[in-house]
C-alpha cells in the first residue's frame, strides 16, 4: 500500500500537474493563462500534459514553465529539479555554419574565367597588330622595289625622262637656226617623217606674169622701202628670220605639239597633293611615266588606251580620264598600293 501511494504521489508531482492544480485553484482557464503569457492555448495544454514539443528548444520550454509558475504563485525551485529529472536538457541542434569557402571557390572560378578572357583579348589584339605590321612592311618593300625599278629604267635610258608623246603623233623638232637658202630661194623644212612644211605665203610670194603692162621700177623700190619700214615697227618676235620669206608665218614649235597631244582624246590628267611614286604604261607596253612626283605637280599623259597605273600612295593624287574622275576610294581605304587599268567605259 505504501508503494502504491508513493507512486501516485510521484505521478502527481510532475510540473504539468502541479501547474494545472495551481491554475484551477485560482479559478483560471487555459485561455486566460495563454492570453496573460502571450502564448498559444496549445502550448499551455502541452505544458500541463508534460508534452515537450520536438521543434521547441528546451530553453524556451523552461522559460514558459517559469512564467507559468510565477503566474500561479508556485516556487520555481520546486519545479526545476523535477523538470530536470523528467526531461534532461537536450543539446540544441546547431546547424553547421556554412563557411565562406564556397563563395571563395566561386570567386576563384570567376577570376580564372576573367583571366582567360583577357588572355584571349590580348592574343587577338597581338595577332591584329602583327598582321597590320606585316602588311605595312610588305607595302613599304613593294614601294621601295618599284622605286628601284624606276631608277634602273632611268639609268638604262641615260638619265633622260620618259617622253610624254603619243605613238601616233609626229614630233616636230624646234628650228632655231635660220632656214638655208639655195640659189636665193628658201629650202623647204621637213619633219622627222620627211614631209615638207610648206606655206601659202611662199606660194603667194611668187609673182604671176599674166599682165603685159610694164612695171615701174622706181615705184616698186619705193613700195619695198615702205614695207621694210613697217616691218621695222613690228615687235622683235614678229621679225622674220634671215633667209625666210617676209610673208611666211613662224613655224610651229615643239611646245605646240606637246599641248596638242595633252589635250587630245584619251588624255590622262593627274593632280598631286603630296609626294607620290607613279608608273603609267599604255596599251602598247610603252612606259609613259615612271618616277616620283612632288606635291602640287600636274601631270598630263596621252597614249593608247587602256592605261595600266601603279600608284604608291593613292591618297596623294586625283586622276581624271577624258574629263571624268577616276575613283581611288577603295585603295585609299585599304591603305595599299593601287594597281588599276583606266580605259573607256
Curated annotation (Swiss-Prot):
Residues 19-79 form the HTH cro/C1-type domain. Pfam families: HTH_25, RodZ_C. One of its GO terms (biological process) is regulation of cell shape. PROSITE patterns: HTH_CROC1. InterPro entries: Bact_Cytoskel_RodZ, Cro/C1-type_HTH, Lambda_DNA-bd_dom_sf, RodZ, RodZ-like_C. It comes from the Bacteria. Residues 229-241 have a biased composition (Low complexity). Keywords: Cell inner membrane, Cell membrane, Cell shape, DNA-binding, Membrane, Signal-anchor, Transmembrane, Transmembrane helix. It is found in: Cell inner membrane. Residues 1-111 are cytoplasmic. Residues 30-49 bind DNA. The chain crosses the membrane at residues 112-132. Residues 151-259 are annotated as: Disordered. Residues 133-345 are periplasmic. GO terms for cellular component: plasma membrane. CDD domains: HTH_XRE. It is a single-pass type II membrane protein. Residues 188-225 have a biased composition (Polar residues). One of its GO terms (molecular function) is DNA binding. The helix-turn-helix (HTH) motif in the cytoplasmic domain of the N-terminus is involved in the formation of spirals to maintain the rigid rod shape. As this protein is anchored in the cytoplasmic membrane, the HTH motif may contribute to protein-protein interactions to form the RodZ helix, which is localized beneath the cytoplasmic membrane. The C-terminal domain may be critical for determination of the rod shape by probably interacting with enzymes required for synthesis of the peptidoglycan layer, including PBPs in the periplasm. Cytoskeletal protein that is involved in cell-shape control through regulation of the length of the long axis. Belongs to the RodZ family. This is Cytoskeleton protein RodZ.
